[in-house]
Amino acid sequence: MAVPVVEPERYEAQLDAKRERVTAQFARFSPPALEVFPSPPSHYRQRCEFRLWHEGDDLFYAMFEVDPSDPKRKEVIRLDDYPVASERINALMPALREALLASDVLRRKLFQVEFLTTLSGEALVTLIYHRQLDAAWEQEARALQTTLGVSIIGRARKQRLVLDRDHVWERLQVEGREFVYQQVENSFTQPNAAICQSMLGWARDVTRESREGDLVEFYCGNGNFTVALAENFRRVVATEISRTSVASANVNLEANAVANAVVARMSAEEFSAALAGEKTGRRVAALALDEHTFTTALVDPPRAGLDAHSCEQLKVYERIVYISCNPDTLEANLEQLSATHVVTRFALFDQFPYTDHCECGVLLERRAPAARA
């Protein structure tokens, strides 16, 4: 992949290009005017990972770019700073590098560094090695942890040493409210926190008149949307298959005093089967699905989007909130969903400036019977 070049002076131009591209791509669905949410033009990414490149006595952060003259060859790009990343990450990069240069124990066979930071300045650093970590490493890593004011995790094959904690606490400001989120190392979190705040605000806005119904959320992760949307609904059932994410989502529900939501460790397909009465068992019984009236579904699928069967299952809901990280798969899914639903809100979130990546939000509402295709 190409290393993004941060040029704040061309930020608006690149955002306008995305706006035009997305507007043209989805024109045939006759959506309302596109709502556009800009990113900070620099220092917008709260998590990053870098290779640690060793050259003699030197070492430096690196990324790789494909050589245009030889697609099979990757060029090593040295990074002394990274304007894409948060200011906290940029402050840590040289301080950590200097500490590594001064310690044979910490630098030996270190090949990757991962940073996870928050808007409030918390930081977690993961050091990944091609060797097993011992007591000498732990002693020096603990000293480094204190010097840098961060939490440190050491990783190697079949080894994970958590010196302090394996997470940070993010605090997001949305519509005058503060939501707190435990974000666990090596699990998915929204990388652009400013845009995440915009996404949560938009999702709250499009579901505001929903208190008489219940929400089902698929692919809920650590409860990012679950926490922010719960007060808009009578009850919420959120599904997720990752044990780590389910545990973190439950922590976040408790941290935000959300009492009307539950997280079920099951796939979207399993939930749909349970809702249809085709799947039973202890976990299904605990959800008491027959006591719910699900009027709204929220989906935030991976880049592959939804398969045809999943789209069919969504058609039973009055409203669908679709958060997409891939306009092409969103377009394909809307082709199927538009037979029964119409796009009534449409948003572009500039999650990754200076790249072709577009994050979109769509609200679909069921067509009147006579209007269905």
Swiss-Prot record:
- Domain of life, per lineage: Bacteria
Give the binding site residues for S-adenosyl-L-methionine. Q190, Y219, N224, E240, D300
Reactions catalysed, as given in the entry: uridine(54) in tRNA + S-adenosyl-L-methionine = 5-methyluridine(54) in tRNA + S-adenosyl-L-homocysteine + H(+); uridine(341) in tmRNA + S-adenosyl-L-methionine = 5-methyluridine(341) in tmRNA + S-adenosyl-L-homocysteine + H(+)
> HAMAP family annotated for this entry?
RNA_methyltr_TrmA
Report the gene name. Answer: trmA
What are the protein's GO molecular function terms?
rRNA binding; tRNA (uracil(54)-C5)-methyltransferase activity, S-adenosyl methionine-dependent; tRNA binding
**Pfam families registered for this protein in UniProt:** tRNA_U5-meth_tr (PF05958)
Under which EC number(s) is this enzyme classified? 2.1.1.-, 2.1.1.35
Keyword line: Methyltransferase, S-adenosyl-L-methionine, Transferase, tRNA processing
Name of the featured protein:
tRNA/tmRNA (uracil-C(5))-methyltransferase
Q: Which InterPro entries match?
A: MeTrfase_TrmA_AS (IPR030390), SAM-dependent_MTases_sf (IPR029063), TrmA_MeTrfase (IPR011869), U5_MeTrfase_fam (IPR010280)
**Which residues does UniProt mark as catalytic?**
C325 (nucleophile), E359 (proton acceptor)
Q: Which PANTHER family match?
A: TRNA/TMRNA (URACIL-C(5))-METHYLTRANSFERASE (PTHR47790), TRNA_TMRNA (URACIL-C(5))-METHYLTRANSFERASE (PTHR47790:SF2)
Please provide, in alphabetical order, the Gene Ontology terms of the cellular component aspect for this entry. Answer: cytosol
List the Gene3D superfamilies hit by this protein, alphabetically: 2.40.50.1070, Vaccinia Virus protein VP39
